[in-house]
UniProtKB/Swiss-Prot annotation:
Protein's name in the database: Profilin
Compartmental location: Cytoplasm, Cytoskeleton
Chain coiled-coil ranges: none
Subunit field text: Occurs in many kinds of cells as a complex with monomeric actin in a 1:1 ratio.
Presence of keyword Nucleotidyltransferase: no
Role according to the record: Binds to actin and affects the structure of the cytoskeleton. At high concentrations, profilin prevents the polymerization of actin, whereas it enhances it at low concentrations. By binding to PIP2, it inhibits the formation of IP3 and DG.
A molecular-function term among this protein's GO annotations: actin monomer binding
Length: 131
């Protein structure tokens, strides 16, 4: 299965009539493996800050999480495993696997819990596959 299939069929899937607004799978170096059409272009320093927070949990909290120039307030995640951000009624979930970052961005009417479920399910599957 191609990385684009993971994004199209598994991250952008329909959940109770809702779906993520955008999603992507990136390498730890920020290289895009696959993305939805509306996924923002990430800056190298944004990817570096995300990777730093996975290695040093809490480092993003003072500055916020930035994706494509959009700032999200960092909320409760799972140190070293999942970063979650909030902006208004929407937000983002980032799951780190051995080789990839799985990123899902959502807005209303999708809920944070639905986004977490979609992103973390794919991330957990990839970890099980050694990815």
């Amino acid at each position: 299965m191609s990385w684009q299939t993971y994004v199209d069929d598994h991250l952008m899937c329909d959940i109770e009539g809702n779906h993520l607004s955008s999603a992507a799978i990136l390498g730890h170096d920020g290289t895009v493996w696959a993305q939805s059409p509306s996924f923002p272009q990430l800056k190298p320093e944004e990817v570096s800050a995300i990777m730093k927070d996975f290695n040093e949990p809490g480092s993003l909290a003072p500055t916020g999480l930035h994706l494509g120039g959009t700032k999200y307030m960092v909320i409760q995640g799972e140190p070293g495993d999942v970063i979650r951000g909030k902006k208004g009624p929407g937000g983002v979930t980032i799951k780190k696997t051995n080789q990839a970052l799985i990123i899902g961005i959502y807005g209303e009417p999708m809920t944070p819990g639905q986004c977490n479920m979609v992103v973390e399910r794919i991330g957990d599957y990839l970890v099980e596959q050694g990815m």
